């Protein structure tokens, strides 16, 4: 996972934080070591800080810890998964959006990809959608994050919001949440 903090319009002024998880099992040791060799070759940022986990934290715990640590320190954060290729103006778009919506309490997350497949939409638009592929947030919004899937599901069901949560029945978020909860046991 890559976190960019205080990135400006130019990548060379961005602070890059890389969170590298440890392997789950001996079979993945070689792949993890290959990734670690690669991340040590990255350049082109003002600073690069690499956090290499000594044990396997798992995806959720690693992301939650990384985002929480950096957003609490910097007040905002841009998050990327490690296998993404971004557009040349990605940082400009994210930083501009973080600035424009910084005080808009109804906006808690900037998403950098569009799954709607609706070509009639403008280049930027508001949508009730969150995702993990290139996103950004502020400490004011992250403080509301609750990683407890059981609690979220209970709240959605109590308020009859599962269809709304599923993007009006267009995406199976509730099913994904139930699977996550099953995996938490």
Residue ranges and their predicted role:
Residues 1-79, 84-185:
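An acidic/histidine-cluster motif and surrounding catalytic segment
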């Amino acid at each position: 996972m890559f976190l960019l903090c205080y990135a400006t319009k130019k990548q060379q002024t961005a602070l890059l934080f890389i969170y590298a998880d440890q392997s789950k099992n001996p079979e993945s040791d070689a792949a993890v070591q290959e990734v670690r060799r690669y991340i040590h070759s990255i350049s082109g940022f003002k600073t690069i800080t690499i956090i290499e986990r000594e044990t396997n934290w798992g995806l959720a715990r690693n992301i939650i810890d990384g985002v929480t640590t950096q957003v609490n320190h910097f007040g905002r954060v841009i998050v990327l998964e490690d296998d993404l290729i971004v557009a040349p103006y990605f940082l400009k778009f994210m930083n501009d959006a973080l600035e424009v919506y910084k005080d808009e309490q109804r906006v808690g997350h900037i998403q950098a990809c569009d799954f709607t497949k609706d070509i009639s939409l403008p280049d930027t638009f508001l949508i009730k959608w969150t995702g993990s592929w290139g996103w950004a947030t502020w400490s004011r919004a992250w403080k509301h994050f609750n990683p407890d899937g059981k609690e979220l599901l209970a709240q959605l069901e109590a308020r009859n919001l599962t269809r709304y949560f599923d993007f009006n029945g267009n995406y199976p978020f509730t099913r994904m949440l139930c699977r996550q909860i099953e995996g938490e046991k």
